[in-house]
Every structure is written in C-alpha cells, then in structure tokens.
C-alpha cells in the first residue's frame, strides 16, 4: 500500500509509489523549490514534498488528524508558502526553504471544537490567496479573511452561503474579481479584500442535489465549476450544464 502512486499517462503502468501514510482526498500540487520540481502531497498523516520523477521525499512535515483523515481542500501555494486547512484540525502555514530542500512550520491555529474555531476549519472548499490575505469558508459557512502572515482573522461574513455543517464555496480568481459558487448553486461575482466582500452579484444557476441527511433537506452542489471560452460548466447528479457568460 502507498499514499501516493504515479502512473504513466500513456500506458497506465505504475511508475512509482511513495509514502506509507494514510490516504485522504486532497489533490497533489506541482511547484518549484530551489529550481527543482516538487510534488506537494497532503496525506492522512502529514505533508510531503516529493521528487515527481521518482517519488523520493525531499521533505516531510507532520499534520496528524485528531479524529480521521478528512482533508479535501488542495494545498494553497503562494511563493514559498504552503497553506492547509482541515475541518477538525484547523489551519497550518508552512514555508519552503529557499536555500535547501526543507520546510518549516510558521503557524498552526486550531479551535477547541468544530463550532469554536480558530483560523480556518474548512472541509471541501480550497481557500484563495489574494495579496497578503487568505479567504475561505469555515466549518459552518463562515466566509473568513485571514492575514496570511499569522492567521489572524480580519473579518467574517455570514451572507455568502447558508449556515450548515460542511458548508462549501468554490473560489476562482478572474482579474480583480472572484467568482464563487456556493453549495446552493448560486454563482456570485465580487471582490474579496481585507475590507470585506464587496460588490457581489448573485444568481442561482444549478439545482442542488438532495442528500439523505436531516440538515441538508435543500440539497447541495459540491462539484467544482469549470470555466472556459466565456462559459461556466457545472454538474449535479442529474445533469451537466453550460452557461454562456
């Protein structure tokens, strides 16, 4: 067993396997560190920077879950910084060394539980990094702005998505605007700044899927939108739609 496996994209043959960590849902990210390609993988036990050709770890940093491996968000890389957010285990900022193949922790904020949170306790949504600030959705739908240098909360907005456990917004940057699809199927266009969520237009474009849970009677849209050729592509469990923008 292995947490990460590389396959030949033409034949599907296995090229290498790496790490004995538990797996989870987060996608790997390919970045540069000191001129070398590094595959950043957030596993069920920590974060690793791998040589993408061989799978050999350049570095590893622990981020063990207090309950279960449940990370879905993709690691957010900005320069030599790596930001991670977990529903139960809060937010962590790492820094990749610019002189060696190493990494160090800058800060880690975690609240006492999923309702009393510090930093950002996100489950599905990948945050977005703009300038010196991070924006993401906390455990019960709180849209938050954090100062990237130390994780301090700058503001919180409760209007972007309904207050529910695991509430989700997908963020896509487009120039000075951010396009946001919330789990009610509403597409929002606005500006995320340290002053707040500004100038938001909002329209329901996809019907949420029903879930067999008491707190989700209205359903959810958890699939990420895709943007291409001035169109947005969206899906639920019943249909795939394309909307001209």
Regions from the PLM with identified roles:
Residues 1-245:
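Noncatalytic, solvent-exposed loop/strand surfaces
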């Amino acid at each position: 067993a292995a947490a990460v496996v590389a396959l030949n994209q033409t034949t599907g043959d296995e090229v290498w396997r790496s790490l004995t960590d538990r797996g989870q849902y987060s996608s790997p990210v390919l970045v540069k560190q000191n001129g070398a390609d590094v595959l950043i993988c957030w596993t069920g036990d920590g974060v690793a920077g791998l040589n993408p050709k061989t799978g050999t770890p350049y570095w590893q940093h622990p981020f063990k879950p207090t309950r279960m491996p449940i990370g879905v968000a993709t690691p957010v890389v900005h320069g030599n910084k790596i930001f991670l957010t977990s529903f139960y285990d809060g937010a962590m900022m790492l820094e990749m060394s610019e002189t060696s193949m190493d990494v160090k922790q800058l800060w880690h904020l975690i609240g006492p539980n999923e309702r009393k949170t510090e930093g950002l306790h996100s489950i599905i949504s990948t945050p977005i990094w703009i300038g010196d600030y991070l924006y993401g959705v906390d455990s019960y739908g709180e849209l938050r702005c954090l100062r990237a240098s130390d994780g301090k909360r700058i503001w919180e907005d409760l209007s972007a998505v309904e207050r529910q456990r695991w509430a989700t917004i997908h963020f896509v940057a487009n120039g000075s605007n951010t396009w946001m699809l919330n789990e009610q199927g509403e597409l929002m266009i606005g500006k995320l700044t340290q002053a707040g969520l500004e100038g938001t237009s909002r329209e329901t474009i996809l019907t949420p899927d029903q879930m067999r849970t008491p707190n989700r009677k209205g359903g959810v849209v958890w699939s990420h939108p895709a943007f291409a050729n001035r169109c947005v592509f969206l899906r639920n469990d019943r249909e795939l739609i394309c909307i001209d923008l």
